[in-house]
């Protein structure tokens, strides 16, 4: 068994995986429409702001949480953005699982045991 052959096999499987296909498809759809692209960027900014506040103060401000909620409502009305966000989460779970499996194969210290 050649390890590189197996890695290429995994790469080919990933290309055909529904999570990857959907993520790429919806990302392309969002990037093709400026308003959708801006919506995702705005959401990311507020999401980062909420995370920063949570790290600094223990919780995000009421104002930031309201912004997140409002952007979430707007996102749910844009099918491309909504599909993209869902596909991104599913891909993220898949990717995290793959990294955990590979980490365990090499050394248990690579895996975060939260």
Curated annotation (Swiss-Prot):
It holds the Pfam family Com_YlbF. It comes from Clostridium novyi (strain NT). The lineage of its organism: Bacteria, Bacillati, Bacillota, Clostridia, Eubacteriales. This is UPF0342 protein NT01CX_2274. Transmembrane segments: none annotated. It comes from the Bacteria. InterPro entries: Com_YlbF, YheA/YmcA-like_dom_sf. Belongs to the UPF0342 family.
